[in-house]
């Protein structure tokens, strides 16, 4: 599931699961090994290549020139622009896929209004429709989510979960043999057939029935959009450009960020054994790029991937609670004398009747929320003006929000 976090900055930075440390530590380790390999070559390796002092000095100067060129090359790569545009598109795409997920409360609430009878057949119909909705989700999500696929490795495994019966499984397999794309659509079509029977038997209100059909269409569209997101990924060339820019930038820093003897001797540079700024920069940019890589497939196995297993379990519980428990439970007695707000809004008069003008009740505060209510929000979009007598009056109470005298200083909006 996407990692939830709260607290101060120190606690957030020390988190491991779903953090930048877990994402980029392997790349950082490889980078530091290569960096210190180049450093050892510059400090000790050149002296071991040739015994001639002049040749070693010439080779060292050539290496220093190459390092300076690499440092200048890093300024030519617009890494911030490329990564910013790339990651912003990937994160927006990731969030749109989460928003595409359909929650069953809306369609089942309409169902309980259309099919509100309490006979056994109506109960079974509501229960079956709720099961078919979750079955369609499970069939579609197992095609796009690695976690759902691991939970239900085959369609037959849905029988053990209770979402599918053996007879329905045979129908689904027969349909799948003829058309591979019809498996997840079939339960939604069964819902339409059930509602057609309900329409013929109970004659529900046309507006409510049309609303249910509209919610079912939105449900179908959400699954189709998820398939589309899974089929059509971010263009490969876009990812390649971002990857090439990121890793080539830090390849050049392997040489360009080396402390050189001439700069150290003249005091232009300090010989920091640990390249602190380069490490921080590496974590920034590589972690930034890894965010785009990890969020490319939001239904995978990474820490920040959307947990469809939890959502499926939650939808199953909510669905059957709506069509069974909530629909069959009696309505609370609202005509009793337990409604405190009703008595506050309609206090009895002297003749025993309720007041014709209701009062607006004030909800009480606890001792913890009392201090928060002492500073209510207020409007600041008004212009005070001088009425010529030395007093300040509000613009709205005297002139409205449209006109002011031309000889007055005012703010127009």
UniProtKB/Swiss-Prot annotation:
Give me the Gene Ontology terms describing cellular component: chloride channel complex; plasma membrane
Q: What does the function comment of this entry state?
A: Forms chloride channels.
- Which Pfam families does this entry report, sorted A to Z? Bestrophin
What lineage, starting at the top, does this entry show? Eukaryota, Metazoa, Ecdysozoa, Nematoda, Chromadorea
What protein name applies here? Answer: Bestrophin homolog 13
Recorded GO terms, molecular function? chloride channel activity
Gene behind the chain: best-13
| Species annotation | Caenorhabditis elegans
Q: Which InterPro entries match?
A: Bestrophin, Bestrophin-like
This protein's major location comes to membrane
Keywords carried by this UniProt record = Cell membrane, Chloride, Chloride channel, Ion channel, Ion transport, Membrane, Transmembrane, Transmembrane helix, Transport
The residue ranges crossing the membrane are 29-49, 72-92, 236-256, 272-292
């Amino acid at each position: 599931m996407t990692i939830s976090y709260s607290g101060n900055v120190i606690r957030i930075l020390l988190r491991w699961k779903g953090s930048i440390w877990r994402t980029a530590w392997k790349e950082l380790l490889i980078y530091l090994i290569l960096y210190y390999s180049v450093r050892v070559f510059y400090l000790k390796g050149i002296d071991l290549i040739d015994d001639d002092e002049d040749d070693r000095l010439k080779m060292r100067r050539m290496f220093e020139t190459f390092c300076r060129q690499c440092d200048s090359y890093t300024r030519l790569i617009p890494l911030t622009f490329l990564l910013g545009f790339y990651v912003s598109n990937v994160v927006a795409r990731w969030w749109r896929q989460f928003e595409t997920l359909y929650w069953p409360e809306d369609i089942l609430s309409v169902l309980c209004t259309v099919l509100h009878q309490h006979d056994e057949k109506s109960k079974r119909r509501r229960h079956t429709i709720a099961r078919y909705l979750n079955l369609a989700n499970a069939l579609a999500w197992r095609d796009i989510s690695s976690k759902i696929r691991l939970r239900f490795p085959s369609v037959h495994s849905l029988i053990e979960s209770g979402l599918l019966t053996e007879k329905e499984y045979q129908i689904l397999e027969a349909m799948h043999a003829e058309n591979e794309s019809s498996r997840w659509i079939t339960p939604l079509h069964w819902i339409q057939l059930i509602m057609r029977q309900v329409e013929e038997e109970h004659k529900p209100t046309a507006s409510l029935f049309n609303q249910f059909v509209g919610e079912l269409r939105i449900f179908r569209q959400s699954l189709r959009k998820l398939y589309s997101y899974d089929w059509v990924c971010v263009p490969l060339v876009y990812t390649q450009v971002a990857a090439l820019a990121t890793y080539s930038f830090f390849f050049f820093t392997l040489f360009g960020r080396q402390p050189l003897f001439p700069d150290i001797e003249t005091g232009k540079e300090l010989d920091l054994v640990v390249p602190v700024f380069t490490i921080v920069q590496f974590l920034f940019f590589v972690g930034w790029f890894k965010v785009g890589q990890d969020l490319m497939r939001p239904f995978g196995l990474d820490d920040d991937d959307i947990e469809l297993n939890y959502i499926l379990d939650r939808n199953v519980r909510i669905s059957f609670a709506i069509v069974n428990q909530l629909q069959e439970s009696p309505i609370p007695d609202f005509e009793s004398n337990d409604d405190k707000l009703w008595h506050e809004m309609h206090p009895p008069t002297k003749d025993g009747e309720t007041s014709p003008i209701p009062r607006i009740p004030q909800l009480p505060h606890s001792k913890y929320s009392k201090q928060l209510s002492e500073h209510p929000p207020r409007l600041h979009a008004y212009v005070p003006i001088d009425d010529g007598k030395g007093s300040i009056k509000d613009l709205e109470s005297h002139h409205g929000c449209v006109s002011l005298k031309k000889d007055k200083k005012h703010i127009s909006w």
